[in-house]
Regions:
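Phosphate/pyrophosphate-binding catalytic cores of soluble transferases and nucleic-acid-acting enzymes
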Residues: 1-318
Length: 318
């Protein structure tokens, strides 16, 4: 099924930007790539772990999918930093905004694809994030606290912001410390919003829980048995990524890392990873529902045909 209106997407007062969001294993990449092919678009990843180099299997980069009928689909915000480097919401927003401008300047459609809600929200709601400089004295004090203690501090100071964090952010001490620094800096509010210069259309892939659970299980098995996920974690650790750092990335990296440290056996690792992945998907659904209650309009779809019907109406509007 073809898109009716192929045109230069920057020729609007508010240029159009498409978003494809959803839970883990929902099929976001496949749909996003197909839409990019149909719409002459490019993908901007909105995944807090896909920015890291060498973390391919566990983050589901699926780079082999970025090709349709022999044509490569260009992507952005994938493989941009080392796993040992710091990467936060402000950096993501800045890089993604530059990618949006670049894509539009070339007359193509930016398509944001991912499941990290806060990354997507920072773009759609146009957060004005703080540029506060690190407070080394305060940072030294915060580094003595555990992850739960850091998160509880954030809840006390900025509850609305804290509840929007994804699991990766909640378990990442570096990010929690940075958020606390920004909030305590007295500079810009961490989530001050400005009117967006873009016309966003948000599509959400919504799979029934039973189907999603089957897909999550299959993905875990495939990653472990066919895609050498354990070897990926071994290589990351061998190349200097600490066990603690791997654990902060959550899910596959956390549980495979613990398995490699002999904290439990292989079967237990799969069981723990499966349970954590199902819970993660539920939290993602809850996060998007909460965002809808705040006023965002997410068009929930089941497949590509449903997406194209909504997109055609969106493109027909000036």
């Amino acid at each position: 099924m073809a898109i009716k209106d192929i045109h230069n997407f920057k020729n609007h007062d508010r240029p159009k930007v498409l978003v494809v969001l959803g839970t883990t294993s929902a099929g976001k990449t496949s749909l996003g790539v197909q839409l990019a092919y149909e719409l002459n678009g490019e993908i901007i990843s909105a995944d807090s772990r896909q920015v890291y180099k060498g973390m391919d299997i566990g983050t589901g980069k699926d780079l082999g999918e970025y090709k349709v009928n022999g044509r490569k689909i260009k992507y952005h915000l994938i493989d941009v930093v080392s796993p040992s480097q710091k990467f936060d919401l402000a950096k993501y927003q800045k890089m993604a905004q530059l990618a949006i401008k670049d894509i539009l300047q070339r007359g193509k459609l930016p398509i944001i694809v991912g499941g990290t809600g806060l990354y997507i929200q920072a773009l759609v709601d146009n957060y004005q994030l703080s540029s506060a400089k690190p407070d080394l004295k305060k940072r030294a004090q915060l580094e003595k606290l555990s992850v739960p203690e850091l998160f509880n501090k954030l809840v006390e100071l900025k509850p609305e912001f804290a509840t929007r964090l994804n699991n990766s952010d909640k378990n990442n001490p570096r990010r929690l410390i940075r958020y606390l620094e920004v909030i305590g800096s007295g500079n810009l509010e961490i989530d001050q919003r400005r009117k967006s210069p873009y016309n966003f259309l948000l599509l959400g892939l919504n799979l029934p829980d039973k189907i999603l659970k089957v897909k999550i299980t299959k993905r875990i098995v495939d990653r472990l048995e066919k895609e050498a996920m354990v070897s990926e974690v071994k290589n990351l650790q061998k190349n200097g990524v600490s066990w603690q750092r791997l654990e902060s990335f959550g899910l596959e990296y956390k549980f495979i890392g613990q398995y490699l440290q002999d904290k439990f056996d292989y079967v237990t690792m799969i069981d723990k990873l499966s349970t954590a992945s199902y819970r993660f998907a539920k939290r993602q659904k809850t996060w998007f529902k909460r965002w809808e209650k705040q006023g965002v309009d997410i068009n929930w779809i089941k497949d590509q045909d449903g997406a194209l019907k909504i997109i055609n109406k969106w493109l027909a509007k000036p």
